[in-house]
Amino acid sequence: KTAIFENWCDFLNYFDASVSVQLSFINQGTQRGEAEKAVNIPAQEDAFNSIRTEYRDMLKNQLAKGNNGLVKAKYITFAIEADSLGAAKSRLARIETDVLNNFKLLGVSARPMTGYERLKMLHGIFHPEGGQFAFDFSWLAPSGLSTKDFIAPSSFRFGEGRYFRMGRKIGAVSFLEILAPELNDRILSDILDLETGVIVNLHIHSIDQTEAIKTIKRKITDLDKMKIEEQKKAVRSGYDMDIIPSDLATFGSEAKNLLQDLQSRNERMFLLTFLVVNMADTKRKLENDVFAAAGIAQKNNCALTRLDYQQEAGLMSSVPLGENLIPIQRGLTTSSTAIFIPFITQELFQTGAALYYGLNALSNNMILCDRKQLKNPNGLILGTPGSGKSFAAKR
C-alpha cells in the first residue's frame, strides 16, 4: 500500500505547470439483464436440469449482493497549450508515452483511446438512460453533420439553480470542500462504491515550484509582519509581547512546515477541483443520492456543496475533455493530492464460458473468469487445511 502511494506521488509530480490533468471516474448503469445473461445456465435434455436451476439461482443471489449492474470506468485526460497543432501533437505524444510508462510502474493497465471510443464514452455520459451509439466517421461529410450531433442528448435544461435536466434524467453537480486537516484514502473509493450512477472528476493543475516557494515565503513575511504589529500593540498596552493570537501562531507554523515540505521533501503544490455529478430519474431519488455522497464527505470532515447557478459549467467540467470551468480550487501538496488513490479494487467479470470463483472481498461483486482466454490458464487453489481445496478442484 505504501509503495502504491509513493509511486502515485511520483506519477503526479511528473506533471509540470504547463500540463492540466483531469481524472474521471464514471459509474454507468447497464441493463440488469446483461449481467444475468452472463450467469445464465440454459437447460438441456438430460436429468441434471434441477442441479442447473439450483446453481443458476445461487449465482443470481450472489449477483444481487454486489453492484455488477454498474460499469466503472477510469479515464485520465491531459491538456496543454501550444502555438500550433503540430507542436501540440508531438508534445502530447511524448507525455502519453511517459504516462503509460508511469502506469506500468504502478501495475496499472492503460491504453490510449481512439476517436470513436471517446465519442462513445461522451455519448454514454449524455445518455445515462442507455441507448445504442451508432456512428462512423465516413458519415460526416455526406450528411453535413458534426460529431456533436451524434453524441448530444435529446435536450438540455439549466434553468433551475440547483439542478439540470438532460433528456429524461435530472442531475446535480456538487464540489467537495476539503476542510479536514487529514484526509482518508477511502473517501474517493467510498463515493465510487455508491450503487448509483455517479461521475467524479478531479482537475489537478501543478503550480511552478519556484513560484509556489516564492508565494509561501511572501505569506510567511506577511505573517511575521502581523506578528510584529501584535507585539508592538502588546508593549503599548503593557502586557507580555509573547502573547499573540493563536490563529497567527498556527498559520505561521503551518506555513513554515509547508515551505519545508516543498524545499526538502520532494513535494509540489497542486490546485485541485473535486466535482461530483449525480443523475436520477426523479428529484427525490436525486436528493437521496446527493445526501448519500454528502454523508461520505461529512464522515471525512469535508463538505459536499451544490454548485448553485453553475450547473452547466459544472457538467461541462465533468466531461473528460481536460477543461475546468469551475474556479473553485484547493491548494494541496503532492502527498495530500495523492491520497485520492483511484486504484482500490480490482474487478474480474468475464462473460462467455466463464466460471464462478466467488465474491470480491472488498466490493462483493462476482468474480467470473474464463482462464482459457489467458496465455497461461493454470490455476492455484490456496486455503487452510480442511477448507475444501480438493473438493473445489474436483468440482
Regions found by a protein language model. Give the residues of each.
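Glycine-rich phosphate-binding loop of nucleotide-binding enzymes
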Residues: 1, 5-13, 352-395
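Extended, folded cores of ATP/NTP-driven motor/assembly subunits in large transport
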Residues: 1-343
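Homeobox/homeodomain signature
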Residues: 66, 252, 347, 357-359, ...
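Pre-P-loop entry segment of helicase/translocase ATPase cores
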Residues: 331-363
